[in-house]
Amino acid sequence: ILPYHRIVKDIKGMEPKAFIGSMKFNFELMAMPGFPCKPVEKHCFGLYVDGEWFHLKAYPDIYAGKDSVGQLDVSILQDKVLGPVLGISDPRTDERIRFMGGNHRLKDLAAAADETGGAAFAMYPTSMEELMTIADEGKLMPPKSTWFEPKLRSGLFIHKLSD
C-alpha cells in the first residue's frame, strides 16, 4: 500500500505565511528548506507551498479518542485542514483538489502545486492493519485513502475471516 497524496489548486486566497500559520493549531510545524518532506511515520505530513517544504506532525489530542476512521491520516487532514481551512468539504467532487499516487516522486508533487500556485500534501501510507481493522468493523475508508501497486486486475482484495 502506497500513500495517496493531495494537491490543492489554491489556498483560498490566503497569503502562504497565513496558510502555514493556520497549521500551528493542530500540528507541530518544522520548515524543511531545500528538502522534499516525505513523512516517515503515522500522523505526519509533508506540506509544500510557495516553493517550500514543511514537516507537519499532528498533535495527539486531535486524534486521541477518535474511532479507527477518524485516526487515519487522510481523515485528520480532511478534518483539520482541507475542510475548515481550505473549504473543501467533499474531496470526491471538489474541483480544487486532485490526487497523486504514491508511485510519483515528491518533486512531481511539488511541480503540480507550483502549476496552480496551490499546495501539496505528502501523505504517509495507510497500513494494512488500519485497512483490515476498518473492514472488520464494517466501516468505509475515506475517499482516496490508499494507492495499491501493482494494480490488481480484479480490483478485489480478499480478507480471510477464519482459519
What would you call each of these model-derived segments?
Residues 1-163:
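Surface-exposed, charge/polar-rich loops and edge strands
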